[in-house]
Amino acid sequence: IFHAVSAFNNAGFSTNSDNLVPFVSDAWLLLPLAGALIGGGLGFPVWAELVRLVRRDRHVVHRISITARMTLAATAVLLVSGTVFFGCMEWTGLLSSMSLGGKLLNSFFASASPRTAGFNAIDYGQAHPITLMGTDILMFIGGGSAGTAGGIKVTTACVLLAAMAAEFTGRETTTIGHRSLPRSVTRQALALSFAGVMVVTLGVVALRFFDPEFSGDQVSFEVLSAFATVGLSTGITASLSAPSQIVLCLIMYLGRVGPTTLVAALAAKSV
């Protein structure tokens, strides 16, 4: 029960000192937990729309909102791409001793967990540096805008990609799914993303200053995990100096409260 609630709320807490590493080959545990943390990361508004869609009157046309569609599509893309990426990078590394099913299972779990709960069934301290970089990206993006996951949110990432596409193709408006987005939405996405990049950059600089003995890959992983309130680690957290740990605490607070506060403030000003 504890792990199920921890997964759905994207807390990532485990009653085991080594998290889910002892259950690395237990599909009956990892798959339900992955489903719970993905479900919690989608957010209740998305689930409410899906329920209404299932229960809809056949004579009434019901459309899923653009936010729900972005959340579902981006989640699916990130899960698939993350699974393929992790499998390719660690097939002969962390996954080398596992069966084919175990490799696929842990690649999928390693794709789902970093954006939300932060459970780990493998030792990230032994992961390839490129694997850590890919996981950094997943953590920074996060989950649904109304979900329990952290990060800048998948909807923000979708808006940024749409804005880039509009700029590259010379279009005046940003469109997603044949719908034009207000300029204020694009500005909010840019502001939120830039604020996130600034917090992460300053955090990495601070930790490298206080603890220069750790590699940039390790430090970046710790900072992004804190910013996205994921909780994954390469194993250096306990060895960090007190100033670095204080910096991580501040980053956790900013990562959890900052994006929501910024978007709410910008939205209030536009009313």
Model-predicted segments: where are they?
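Membrane-proximal intracellular helices of multi-pass ion channels
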Residues: I1-V271
